[in-house]
Amino acid sequence: MSTFIFPGDSFPVDPTTPVKLGPGIYCDPNTQEIRPVNTGVLHVSAKGKSGVQTAYIDYSSKRYIPSVNDFVIGVIIGTFSDSYKVSLQNFSSSVSLSYMAFPNASKKNRPTLQVGDLVYARVCTAEKELEAEIECFDSTTGRDAGFGILEDGMIIDVNLNFARQLLFNNDFPLLKVLAAHTKFEVAIGLNGKIWVKCEELSNTLACYRTIMECCQKNDTAAFKDIAKRQFKEILTVKEE
């Protein structure tokens, strides 16, 4: 279901149905009332096997604003006595990553990250007047849940709308198109960053170029042809 919606509008989803909230939607912690906070197109996915729907607002914005439960990719830009300073987007405020925000972390057992390292994390706190905080584990289970340090691979900057489509829209074909050509690992950040890694560097480069071109053209019907051409060009250069 897709509906154009404004801030303050009623939320057109059955309140008795479990809903996973994405960007542009706020849940009042006191009343549990769900309401939109951005103007855009509301997308509500069909129920999955777990019976949970996913809802998010697709709105136009070039600046990323951290929101609780957002998946993000950050770059370590500084270290302090008890936390790391992380950049989520150029020319935007940094966020904080505690030394304890990792699986099984303790004062004696904590990860050692260097400036320039990439991390995949979840936004755990985001207050207007305070620095946002991220964590590299699932606080409900204590496990990494796919979060942590991103080693090797390539990082791609895309627009925020493209990242939201890739993460939330199950019908968005890009990942299936790439999977038809190679095996790969991917991390998608709602801050407009995508990390991709393949066993061979040539395939990683082909994935990088495919994602970049698909983001620029944003024509889902052309994704297959774009991927086919990019992988063919990389393979030709490799053979030469």
From Swiss-Prot:
One of its GO terms (cellular component) is nuclear exosome (RNase complex). Keywords: Cytoplasm, Exosome, Nucleus, RNA-binding, rRNA processing. Disulfide bonds: none annotated. Its main location: cytoplasm. Residues 67-137 form the S1 motif domain. CDD domains: KH-I_Rrp40, S1_Rrp40. It holds the Pfam family RRP40_S1. One of its GO terms (biological process) is nuclear-transcribed mRNA catabolic process. It is found in: Cytoplasm; Nucleus, Nucleolus. InterPro entries: Exosome_RNA_bind1/RRP40/RRP4 (IPR026699), KH_dom_type_1 (IPR004088), KH_dom_type_1_sf (IPR036612), NA-bd_OB-fold (IPR012340), RRP40_KH-I (IPR049469), Rrp40_N_euk (IPR041054), Rrp40_S1 (IPR037319). GO terms for molecular function: manganese ion binding; RNA binding. Belongs to the RRP40 family. Non-catalytic component of the RNA exosome complex which has 3'->5' exoribonuclease activity and participates in a multitude of cellular RNA processing and degradation events. In the nucleus, the RNA exosome complex is involved in proper maturation of stable RNA species such as rRNA, snRNA and snoRNA, in the elimination of RNA processing by-products and non-coding 'pervasive' transcripts, such as antisense RNA species and cryptic unstable transcripts (CUTs), and of mRNAs with processing defects, thereby limiting or excluding their export to the cytoplasm. Component of the RNA exosome complex. Specifically part of the catalytically inactive RNA exosome core complex (Exo-9) which may associate with the catalytic subunits RRP6 and DIS3 in cytoplasmic- and nuclear-specific RNA exosome complex forms. Exo-9 is formed by a hexameric base ring of RNase PH domain-containing subunits and a cap ring consisting of CSL4, RRP4 and RRP40. Present with 6050 molecules/cell in log phase SD medium. PANTHER family: EXOSOME COMPLEX COMPONENT RRP40, PNAS-3 RELATED. This is Exosome complex component RRP40.
